[in-house]
Amino acid sequence: MSSDAAAQERLPGLLLVLSAPSGAGKTTLAHRLREASPDAVFSISATTRAPRGAEREGVDYHFVTAERFTELVAQGAFAEWAEVHGQRYGTLRATVDEALAAGKLALFDIDVQGGAQIKAAWPQQAATVLVLPPDEAELERRLRGRDTDSDETIRRRLVAARAEVARGLGSYDYVVVNDVLEGALAQLQAIVRHERLRHAGRWDPEAARVAEACRRSAAPLGGWAS
């Protein structure tokens, strides 16, 4: 094992929260980051919905009954939870603590409200990133390019996007504009390296430069600035 690889293994765990309006490319970025990071894992949520297709317990979700979910809520077991389309989803505190204790990079693909709750629960170990398309026109183009949604659905998604972006710009640590996928991925990797080194009391000037340029207060927001 090289000295660089050994140093990477000794880095502390990090919770990386990725939030974005639908169509920004967040999920693709999250999977690319996972593939490029040997110690990265996706946070596994608990849910009341039934498994779909090849989904597996403990791999894709923790599948629980509605009654058990209610018990877990009452016990304070969730760092965050929400109801979506009649089913409940939540992040278990124990799962997150295990990832941190193991020195993992835990990836969260959740909305801004959930991300804010993760940040509140682990303020020192969590970094929140808002992923944006270059502007609203590009977001609409991407949504229409899917060719799966009606005009009314796209309209609703754009309204929801404006609200989600406004919430994220008001609270998140970083902003990454996903114009070119590889460039956005490189920015995420720099943010991860900067945050983990910072917690270890170490420094990488280039990672710090890129990460600081993505700070919410410094990031170029393009068509989302108004």
Swiss-Prot record:
Chain residues that bind ATP: 20-27
UniProt superkingdom: Bacteria
GO cellular component, as recorded: cytosol
Task of the protein: Essential for recycling GMP and indirectly, cGMP.
Family named by the database record: Belongs to the guanylate kinase family.
UniProt cross-references to CDD domains, sorted A to Z: GMPK
Ranges of residues in domain Guanylate kinase-like: 13-193
UniProt entry tagged with the keyword Kinase: yes
Entry protein name: Guanylate kinase
MF (Gene Ontology): ATP binding; guanylate kinase activity
UniProt-listed SMART domains: GuKc
UniProt-annotated location(s): Cytoplasm
InterPro entries in UniProt: GK/Ca_channel_bsu, Guanylate_kin-like_dom, Guanylate_kinase, Guanylate_kinase_CS, P-loop_NTPase
Catalyzed chemical reaction(s): GMP + ATP = GDP + ADP
EC top class named in words: transferase
Keyword terms, alphabetized: ATP-binding, Cytoplasm, Kinase, Nucleotide-binding, Transferase
EC number, as in UniProt: 2.7.4.8
